[in-house]
């Protein structure tokens, strides 16, 4: 595996310079703008008339722990299925997540909690930043193995900014309801990544085809990610919902939807599989589609039956997408979707947005009673009818797709800059490009025996 001195020198400097520059810049911005909010500032908290039990920390922190584990353990392990890319899948998840959390705190803070010349942060800030990091990691899944760490950091820089802007437009300007992020997280992250992958299309990626598959143990590790995500998804969707009835209803709807998507995934996987055998790719991914599809509607009066029906449909669509639609994406649309984010996050996210609009249009005062204020405040206050709110929900989906597509194009053009050291076509999906790998010299000897055409740079 020959490495030119220029490439080695560039890699040695580029990633450290970007990491140190971004960390230094965010640290300066934190020093200037970021302050504790009323519930975490010692003087402000003790100056108020309340007990320690009233602090939001004790209500939000359990959900934050679950969401945090999903972002770093769930997403990270879900992407280790590639046989020679486990270090990068986990390591770059760690890197992107850490940077995205800091940058999202600033972007979301300026848009949502900036007053008195400062950004005020608390538990909700941490959860919102994790949501943003989740969207970045969804996009990472679409370009997994085909991008270097410097490219990924720049992708995160752009995506976090656009995520924050899209979220602000939907939630604050349009008054859209999206508790579990079917639109703001899953749809945005998926289509940002898919358009990015299209712009970065590699016509000679078959040179790395022998590394694109999984092996027995890599699929087992990926199932760890699946189980983590499956267990904690009710916390993900309910993390920022209201106290009282809102949070438990959101958790229940997500819980039942996940169970249904799992059963439909097993059923469809066996039905379309060779000789009726299950495909681990389907189980690892499509079983989670139930959590995505109820994201928007999870806090609404979906009913347990509605949650089961939505999850069953999402699991089926996701499984069929992996079997039939992913090959079409690559062959016809030239979108190389490494992790199949279109099947797990894209289509279920859009379906979830449509489900949310449907449930919004069916909203009645009788069904929600006094709880209407916490779920649909604009309807409760008489500013909108249920039908008009449903139209706003659909418009929010359109805005999200627009932001994601435009961002993906811009990001793709940015990541094509030649100095960013993209891996060559023959070395995609390979940890040795960036990591010290145990036993790599023996592996290099085997690789040297392969007859390959000259590399084509991205």
Curated annotation (Swiss-Prot):
Catalytic activity: NH4(+)(in) = NH4(+)(out); methylamine(out) = methylamine(in); CO2(out) = CO2(in)
Glycosylated residue positions: 49
Membrane topology, Extracellular segments: 35-61, 108-124, 171-178, 241-251, 304, 368-393
Database matches in PANTHER family: AMMONIUM TRANSPORTER (PTHR11730), AMMONIUM TRANSPORTER RH TYPE B (PTHR11730:SF42)
Pfam family, one: Ammonium_transp
Family: Belongs to the ammonium transporter (TC 2.A.49) family. Rh subfamily.
Role played: Ammonium transporter involved in the maintenance of acid-base homeostasis. Transports ammonium and its related derivative methylammonium across the basolateral plasma membrane of epithelial cells likely contributing to renal transepithelial ammonia transport and ammonia metabolism. May transport either NH4(+) or NH3 ammonia species predominantly mediating an electrogenic NH4(+) transport. May act as a CO2 channel providing for renal acid secretion.
Keywords for the protein's UniProt record, in alphabetical order: Ammonia transport, Cell membrane, Glycoprotein, Membrane, Transmembrane, Transmembrane helix, Transport
Membrane topology: Multi-pass membrane protein
UniProt-listed InterPro entries: Ammonium/urea_transptr (IPR029020), NH4_transpt_AmtB-like_dom (IPR024041), RhesusRHD (IPR002229)
GO MF entry, a single one: ammonium channel activity
PTM entry text: N-glycosylated.
Name the UniProt record assigns to this protein: Ammonium transporter Rh type B
The keyword Cell membrane appears for this protein: yes
Compartments in which it is found: Cell membrane; Basolateral cell membrane
Nuclease keyword on record: no
Ranges where the record places region Interaction with ANK3: 416-424
Membrane-crossing residue ranges in chain numbering: 14-34, 62-82, 87-107, 125-145, 150-170, 179-201, 220-240, 252-272, 283-303, 305-325, 347-367, 394-414
């Amino acid at each position: 595996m020959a490495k030119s001195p220029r490439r080695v020198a560039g890699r040695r400097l580029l990633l450290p310079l970007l990491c140190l520059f971004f960390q230094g810049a965010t640290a300066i911005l934190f020093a200037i703008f970021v302050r504790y909010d009323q519930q975490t500032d010692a003087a402000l908290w003790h100056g108020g008339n309340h007990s320690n039990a009233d602090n939001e920390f004790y209500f939000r922190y359990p959900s934050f722990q679950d969401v945090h584990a999903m972002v770093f353990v769930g997403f990270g392990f879900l992407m280790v299925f590639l046989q020679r890319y486990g270090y990068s899948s986990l390591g770059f998840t760690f890197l992107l997540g850490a940077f995205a959390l800091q940058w999202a705190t600033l972007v979301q803070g300026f848009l949502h909690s900036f007053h008195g010349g400062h950004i005020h942060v608390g538990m909700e800030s941490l959860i919102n930043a994790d949501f943003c990091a989740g969207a970045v990691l969804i996009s990472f899944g679409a370009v997994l193995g085909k991008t270097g760490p410097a490219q990924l950091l720049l992708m995160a820089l752009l995506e976090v900014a656009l995520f924050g802007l899209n979220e602000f437009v939907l939630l604050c300007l349009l008054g859209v309801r999206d508790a579990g992020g079917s639109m703001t997280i899953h749809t945005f992250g998926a289509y940002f990544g898919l358009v990015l992958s299209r712009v970065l299309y590699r016509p000679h990626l078959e040179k790395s085809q022998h590394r694109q598959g999984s092996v027995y143990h890599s699929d087992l590790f990926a199932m760890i990610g699946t189980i983590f995500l499956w267990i904690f998804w009710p916390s993900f969707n309910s993390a920022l919902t209201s106290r009282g009835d809102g949070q438990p209803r959101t958790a229940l709807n997500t819980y039942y939807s996940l169970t249904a998507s799992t059963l439909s995934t097993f059923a469809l996987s066996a039905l379309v599989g060779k000789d009726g055998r299950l495909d681990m790719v389907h189980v690892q991914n499509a079983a989670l589609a139930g959590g995505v599809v109820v994201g928007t509607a999870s806090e609404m009066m979906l009913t347990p039956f509605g949650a089961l029906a939505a999850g069953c449909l999402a699991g089926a669509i996701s499984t069929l997408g992996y079997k039939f639609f992913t090959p079409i994406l690559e062959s016809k649309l030239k979108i190389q979707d490494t992790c199949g984010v279109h099947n797990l996050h894209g289509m279920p996210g859009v379906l979830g947005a449509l489900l949310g609009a449907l449930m919004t249009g069916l909203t009645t005062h009788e069904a929600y009673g006094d709880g209407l204020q916490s779920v649909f405040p604009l309807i409760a206050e008489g500013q909108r009818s249920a039908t008009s709110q449903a139209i706003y929900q659909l418009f929010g989906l359109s805005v999200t797709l627009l932001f994601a597509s435009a961002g993906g194009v811009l990001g793709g053009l940015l990541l094509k800059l030649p100095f960013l050291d993209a891996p060559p076509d023959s070395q995609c999906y390979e940890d040795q490009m960036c990591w010290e790998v145990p036993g790599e010299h023996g592996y290099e000897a085997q690789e040297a025996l392969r007859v390959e055409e000259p590399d084509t740079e991205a």
